[in-house]
């Protein structure tokens, strides 16, 4: 059983992460350890531990003599580069997964899809703490399970290093809009190809899903350009 200090550190980390994702601490905002400790009614120690974890997830950055600051949103070019990297990893990963995936993994994938569908029915759009966190985690589980089934640790490690669901999830928090139902449709196409052990179809379904995801992000950026500008400047 975790000790009290470990539980407290984990709780502080989750609270700070939630505030970053919900734009309470907007991109570019400085994070002062003493001020955070007062705000969250804890000592500086769990704050430092939480900051270290958040920095590892690239949600915040640290500069010598300047301290911590909430990381900026990805630029348009970086979003494109991130999605390109995903395609390089996940498309071939899906092709391999279709070859290797076993019934227990297929059952797990199907259960995740059902939970995503259930979450999408009552998620409060735009709120990390009221539903989207669960949806985001389930979507992450879906993609990671496929790469796990690909039976290539290097592909899985490369995917995890991208920190995809945190980076892209922050955009949905800004725009307070997402199309979960369409995501479910795209996931179903991937699942059916995996279940049929059709590598080419699985690769094509993942390619289509990632392309659609990128288009959704850029549509939101085009629709809410002022929101991106405001957040980038760290305004509330």
Model-predicted regions and their roles:
Residues 1-99, 222-236:
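Short linear motifs at protein or domain termini
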Residues 7, 61, 133, 180-181:
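Short helix-capping and inter-helix turn/linker motifs at the boundaries of alpha-helical repeat units
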Residues 45, 82, 169-172, 216-219:
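Juxtamembrane helix-loop transition sites at the ends of transmembrane segments
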Residues 211-225:
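Short, charge-rich amphipathic alpha-helical segments embedded
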């Amino acid at each position: 059983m975790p000790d009290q200090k470990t539980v407290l550190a984990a709780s502080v980390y989750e609270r700070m992460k939630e505030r970053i994702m919900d734009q309470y601490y907007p991109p570019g905002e400085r994070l002062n350890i003493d001020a955070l400790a007062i705000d969250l009614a804890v000592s500086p120690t769990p704050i430092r531990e939480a900051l270290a974890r958040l920095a590892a997830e690239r949600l915040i950055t640290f500069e010598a003599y300047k301290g911590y600051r909430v990381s900026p949103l990805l630029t348009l070019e970086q979003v494109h580069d991130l999605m390109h990297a995903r395609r390089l990893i996940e498309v071939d990963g899906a092709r391999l997964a279709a070859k290797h995936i076993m019934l227990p993994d297929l059952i797990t994938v199907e259960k995740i899809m059902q939970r995503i569908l259930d979450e999408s029915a009552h998620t409060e759009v735009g709120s990390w703490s009221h539903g989207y966190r669960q949806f985001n985690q389930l979507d992450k589980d879906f993609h990671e399970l496929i790469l796990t089934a690909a039976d290539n640790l290097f592909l899985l490690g490369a995917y995890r290093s991208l920190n995809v669901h945190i980076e892209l999830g922050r955009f949905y928090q800004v725009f307070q809009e997402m199309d979960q139902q369409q995501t479910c449709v795209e996931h179903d196409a991937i699942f059916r190809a995996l279940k049929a052990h059709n590598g080419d179809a699985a690769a094509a379904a993942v390619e289509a899903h990632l392309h659609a995801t990128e288009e959704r992000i850029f549509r939101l950026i085009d629709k809410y350009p002022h929101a991106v500008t405001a957040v980038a400047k760290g305004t509330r």
